[in-house]
Regions:
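A non-catalytic, helix-rich entry segment at domain boundaries
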Residues: 1-48
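Nucleic-acid nuclease catalytic cores
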Residues: 73-76, 80-143
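A short linear-motif detector with a strong N-terminal bias
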Residues: 22-27, 67-68, 102-105
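Active-site metal-binding core of divalent-cation-utilizing nuclease and nuclease-like domains
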Residues: 35-83
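Catalytic core segments in nucleotide and nucleic-acid processing enzymes
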Residues: 104, 144-147, 152-156, 160-161
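Surface-exposed cleft-lining segments at the edges of enzyme active sites
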Residues: 12-19, 65, 90-95
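Accessory terminal regions of nucleic-acid processing enzymes
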Residues: 163-167
Length: 167
């Protein structure tokens, strides 16, 4: 089962600073990333491109996904390293209403494939200036794999919809 943990985090403070400094909503995303990269010692990168060739994945449900060109691509907003874990963060205005686990987990799959870093060493998180949510990537993996087994080895509709939107 996936347990989403709502917690306090400096990312919310940095988002508040960005909101105060930038009037244009379209530039706030960039401002949050820039402020965190320059001022947060845990943040190691922003806008990290990730990709994976679906047919070469060792994860069975990813192999079964359909795409226009056999690849999935995306950009991780913020990458952090803290407490011996790699954090994949997504700045989402209105974070409390968002449900980005599919997106974040696909990013984790891509990152794991390209770096060899196991899900057990990754956390997925999304935040805005008021809320910060995180989950263990391994919990998401276990839940997805269990669902995959139960559904007779079919990719969930939600995951397939996400994949089709990103390709």
């Amino acid at each position: 089962m996936v347990r989403v943990k709502k917690t306090l985090n400096n990312a919310c403070e940095f988002a508040n600073i960005a909101i105060e400094l930038v009037d244009d909503n379209r530039k706030r995303h960039w401002a949050v990333e820039k402020i965190m990269l320059e001022n947060d010692t845990s943040t190691i990168a922003t806008e990290v491109p990730v990709y994976m060739q679906l047919s070469t994945s060792t994860i069975p449900w990813i192999k079964d996904m359909k795409s226009k060109n056999d690849y999935i691509t995306g950009h991780i907003d913020l990458l952090q390293y803290r407490n011996k874990k790699l954090y994949i963060l997504d700045y989402k205005p209105g974070a409390a209403k968002e449900k980005p686990l599919g997106q974040l987990f696909v990013y984790a799959c891509c990152l794991s494939k390209s770096t060899g870093i196991h899900f057990v060493r990754m956390k997925l998180a999304w935040f805005d200036n008021e809320n910060y949510y995180e989950v263990d990537a391994m919990d998401v993996y276990k839940t997805v794999m269990e669902s995959f087994k139960i559904s007779n080895r079919k990719v969930s509709k939600k995951m397939q919809i996400y994949i089709n939107k990103t390709l």
